[in-house]
Swiss-Prot record:
The gene is CS26. This is S-sulfo-L-cysteine synthase (O-acetyl-L-serine-dependent), chloroplastic. Pyridoxal 5'-phosphate binds at residues 171, 275-279, 353. GO terms for molecular function: cysteine synthase activity. Its EC number is 2.5.1.144. Optimum pH is 8-9. CDD domains: CBS_like. Pfam families: PALP. It comes from Arabidopsis thaliana (Mouse-ear cress). Its cofactor is pyridoxal 5'-phosphate. It is found in: Plastid, Chloroplast thylakoid lumen.
């Protein structure tokens, strides 16, 4: 499987390709509106608008203001140049509008950027994959679309008929919610009552119905409640993201290839949060398929790990633990501190999970054995989703106390 290098990604259908093509045609057309005459007082050719000659011919004056001595009729303009079929096709493609059919077509192809100021002491380069720039600001936008499309293609769900039900801690629910809104589905999400208020507000803004569950039961409590709702609701359907292979598939088909292409295959280490297991398994699986020597590193919170530690969380069925070369445990405090630094020093407003992934990436980049390597780290969500959390608690107090 081969992918074009970044330098070859400019296509006629791309916005920049269309602009470049149109500018070229505009420049060519504009040049035809000018004629050139020689100024005896200068060695330069003076560009004079053709319109001036036309006015001169009508008024009997030339563009220099003198009487026109010629009474002969002007020769008709030459016929336009003959274009080949290929040229006409290129022009037609270049004039295609760059407008998505709906918001789902904006998902994916997120940019990558080097980290520069939080990398003191690093021996390897670190490039971040900004999933925070998805249309609904999270890597979960990809699986929201993937799971809905897979279910539609199998005939399991139908817009304006099926009621979608899904347990979530916020980001996956939002990824499903905005796609459901665009396609015409009703959505019910179950979530622990401990989830921050802005995620609830965003879900409601997108039309989702929210059912809160006992926070002490964690995500498992939300899963159990979702199953209960499905049994009681007509035409209800539950995606079961933790066991849904569409979760992994979309990252194998899109996220992995995007990283491979943007790095021109030079990635050495891939770092991502474990979460549902879909991102790290799908993306890591593709990268290892392309180069078996690429290391895949999973990141999990030390307070509630799913693989290691004394407080195991909910182990996703789609997580391929054997794919992981290493697992990093990062504390909530470390993740918050790094997320704040990313905003202040890199201009990247990202969430707590992104901070955790960055902590792991920086630690790896300081190892002697990784000197000169390229580490790619996935930032899964935007910082605006964490305004009322501990990430911005001090700023929240500061702005609340502001007076005019």
């Amino acid at each position: 499987m081969a992918f074009a290098s970044p330098s070859l990604r400019l296509l006629p259908q791309s916005p920049l390709g269309r602009i470049t093509s149109k500018l070229h045609r505009f420049s060519t057309a504009k040049l035809s509106l000018f004629s050139f005459h020689h100024d005896s007082s200068s060695s330069l050719a003076v560009r004079t608008p053709v319109s001036s000659f036309v006015v001169g011919a009508i008024s009997g004056k030339s563009s220099t203001g003198t009487k026109s001595k010629s009474k002969t009729k002007r020769k008709p303009p030459p016929p336009p140049p003959v274009t080949t079929v290929a040229e006409e096709q290129h022009i037609a493609e270049s004039e295609t509008v760059n407008i998505a059919e709906d918001v789902t077509q904006l998902i994916g192809s997120t940019p990558m950027v080097y980290l520069n100021r939080v990398t003191d002491g690093c021996l390897a380069d670190i490039a971040a994959k900004l999933e925070s720039m998805e249309p609904c600001r999270s890597v979960k936008d990809r699986i929201g679309l993937s799971m809905i499309n897979e279910a539609e293609n199998s005939g399991a769900i139908t817009p304006r008929k099926t009621v979608l039900v899904e347990p979530t801690t916020g980001n996956t629910g939002l990824g499903i919610a905005f796609v459901a809104a665009a396609k015409g589905y009703k959505l019910i999400v179950t979530m622990p009552a401990s989830i921050n208020i802005e995620r609830r507000m965003l879900l409601r803004a997108l039309g989702a119905e929210i059912v809160l569950t006992n926070p002490e039961k964690g995500l498992k409590g939300a899963v159990d409640k979702a199953k209960e709702i499905v049994l009681k609701t007509k035409n209800a359907y539950m995606f079961q993201q933790f066991d849904n292979t569409a979760n992994t598939k979309i990252h194998f088909e899109t996220t992995g290839p995007e990283i491979w292409e943007d790095t021109m295959g030079n990635v050495d280490i891939f770092v991502a949060g474990i979460g549902t297991g879909g991102t790290v398994t799908g993306t890591g699986g593709f990268l290892k398929m392309m180069n078996k020597d690429i290391k895949v590193v999973g990141v999990e919170p030390s307070e509630r790990s799913v693989i290691s530690g004394d407080n195991p969380g909910y182990l996703p069925g789609i997580l391929d633990v054997k794919l992981l070369d290493e697992v990093f445990k990062v504390s909530n405090g470390e993740a918050i501190e790094m997320a704040r630094r990313l905003a202040l020093e890199e201009g990247l407003l990202v969430g707590i999970s992104s901070g955790a992934a960055a902590v792991a990436a920086v630690s790896l980049a300081k190892r002697a054995e990784n000197a000169g390597k390229l580490i790619t780290v996935l930032f899964p969500s935007h910082g605006e989703r964490y305004i009322t959390t501990a990430l911005f608690s001090s700023i929240n107090r500061e702005v609340q106390e502001m007076r005019y």
